[in-house]
């Protein structure tokens, strides 16, 4: 869907891929995407780097952390995050194999619930993870963006430290999935 829109729109637009990204779909967006919000595996990072290299680009990425109680949501747990950051850091220093991606932050989605105390707890947990790792820095790793909060909970997310919110439904209305 994004590729169809990209072909019709001005080429100076910065495109963000929001949502779960399948590894086999990266090749379709690597030519133009500026930021991929939902990177949830080391394998996906490798594929983004591979496809970005083909286009001589650097693609910014947010690592998605699983903070919700819902199992249907994607994301890394804290151990997987730490493994990626260690592997990424060592890959950077050893052979700079990830020169076509830059990890610029973390993102997470809270549980879909009316319980604001639970949502706040999940947002604060992600903020603590972000703060714990925000001092890490290499040529392609610097956590500057904390993306949490959507149209229904963005104000709470901002109060918990979010630096980027996803509020497309508030601006454009609900999506029509056909």
Segments predicted by a language model, with ranges:
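Divalent-metal-activated hydrolytic enzyme cores
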Residues: 163-164
């Amino acid at each position: 869907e994004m590729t169809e829109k990209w072909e019709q729109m001005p080429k100076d637009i910065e495109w963000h891929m929001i949502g779960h990204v399948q590894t086999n779909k990266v090749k379709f967006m690597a030519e133009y995407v500026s930021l991929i919000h939902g990177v949830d595996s080391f394998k996906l990072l490798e594929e983004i780097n591979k496809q970005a290299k083909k286009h001589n680009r650097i693609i910014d990425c947010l690592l998605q952390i699983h903070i919700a109680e819902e199992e249907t949501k994607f994301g890394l747990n804290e151990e997987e995050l730490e493994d990626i950051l260690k592997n990424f850091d060592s890959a950077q220093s050893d052979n700079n194999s990830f020169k076509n991606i830059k990890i610029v932050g973390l993102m997470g989605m809270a549980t879909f619930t009316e319980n604001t105390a639970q949502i706040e707890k999940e947002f604060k947990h992600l903020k603590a993870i972000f703060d714990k790792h925000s001092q890490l820095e290499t040529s392609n790793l610097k956590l500057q963006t904390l993306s949490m909060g959507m149209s229904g909970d963005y104000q709470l997310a901002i109060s918990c430290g979010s630096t980027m919110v996803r509020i497309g439904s508030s601006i454009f209305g609900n999506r029509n999935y056909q």
